[in-house]
């Protein structure tokens, strides 16, 4: 109250401050022009902000705490699981994960972060699907999001790294392959085969696109496009995004393709495409043999760079022969 007509009030939001307590600029701002009728009230109906701190500029006097109210928004999914233990650290980790999922799930899909890009990256989706679907009844979210991926597919099966696809986003095969993994996980976790039945043709088309970029039995880098950048492998390596080692990038991406072949074979059988199931399984077995032959060093019992992911992924997808598995595990643990 008490603001003259035309007074300009600015509110800046951030989830970080610098050493002096100043907000770090995250380009989250609202501007309000006062009516001057003594009944000023502002609620942004067209945007949201993710923040821990807010700074108000343009008021003639210090506002009261009760003058402000923050409203949390998120997808209306149902909590389906709880976790408690005698370990306060584990309880805190669980609670932080649950809160993070609430912050990332809105607009009917998951985003990478709620304050900067706000984009539905497939890599973030693949890495969070199992935990979100374990904690929550979120099948409607995945029905909406997988449809966005299907809608974003280009002629010939090419996919972006982000859906809905408003522009280019960085990633790799693990991002595009959300269209395979999300329907599979939704059926596995919820017993809901709607996405498998509806999007199996799109999954099959994307696998065909992948195969057009295979050379000597391995997936190679596909081109950047106006809607897709990069060809990442392990983007969560301990020392940063591991894009510098081509062997690691190739190993990780081909292991993911192997995993996609396995899921496609299972979903092909589920949908009555038995001949296609056998073909996908044969391609998986051939790819696994090539992965092992190309990236395994028998002298050191390591794959590619010997990083944790390079060592574990071939075992997870079945590329490591049973006779060598114990040695690879021992080398990993050392």
Write out the residue ranges for each language-model feature:
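Active-site core of glycosidic bond-cleaving carbohydrate-active enzymes
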Residues: 120-334
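Phosphate-binding glycine-rich loops and their immediate beta-loop-alpha structural context
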Residues: 117
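Extracellular/oxidizing-compartment recognition motifs
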Residues: 1-114, 123-124, 140-143, 160-164, ...
């Amino acid at each position: 109250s008490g603001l003259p007509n035309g007074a300009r009030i600015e509110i800046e939001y951030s989830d970080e401050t610098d050493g002096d307590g100043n907000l770090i600029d995250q380009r989250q701002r609202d501007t309000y022009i006062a009516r001057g009728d003594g009944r000023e009230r502002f609620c942004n109906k067209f945007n949201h902000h993710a923040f821990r701190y807010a700074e108000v500029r343009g008021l003639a006097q210090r506002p009261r705490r009760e003058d402000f109210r923050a409203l949390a928004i998120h997808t209306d999914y149902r909590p389906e699981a709880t976790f408690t233990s005698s370990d306060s650290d584990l309880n805190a980790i669980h609670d932080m994960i649950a809160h993070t999922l609430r912050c990332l799930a809105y607009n009917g899909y998951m985003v990478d972060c709620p304050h900067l890009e706000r984009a539905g990256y497939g890599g973030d989706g693949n890495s969070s699907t199992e935990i979100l679907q374990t904690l929550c009844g979120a099948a409607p979210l995945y029905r909406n999001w997988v449809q966005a991926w299907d809608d974003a597919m280009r002629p010939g099966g090419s996919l972006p790294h982000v859906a809905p696809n408003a522009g280019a986003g960085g990633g790799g095969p693990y991002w595009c392959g959300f269209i395979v993994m999300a329907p599979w996980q939704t059926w596995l976790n919820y017993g809901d085969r709607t996405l498998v039945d509806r999007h199996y043709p799109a999954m099959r088309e994307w696998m065909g696109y992948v195969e057009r970029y295979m050379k000597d039995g391995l997936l190679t880098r596909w081109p950047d496009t106006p809607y897709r950048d990069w060809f990442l492998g392990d983007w969560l390596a301990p020392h940063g995004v591991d894009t510098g080692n081509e062997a690691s990038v190739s190993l990780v991406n081909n292991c993911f393709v192997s995993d996609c072949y396995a899921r496609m074979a299972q979903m092909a059988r589920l949908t009555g495409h038995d001949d296609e199931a056998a073909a996908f399984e044969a391609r998986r077995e051939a790819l696994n043999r090539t992965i092992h032959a190309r990236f395994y060093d028998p002298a050191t019992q390591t794959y590619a760079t010997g990083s944790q992911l390079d060592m574990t992924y071939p075992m997870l997808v079945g590329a490591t022969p049973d006779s060598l598995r114990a040695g690879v595990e021992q080398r990993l643990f050392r």
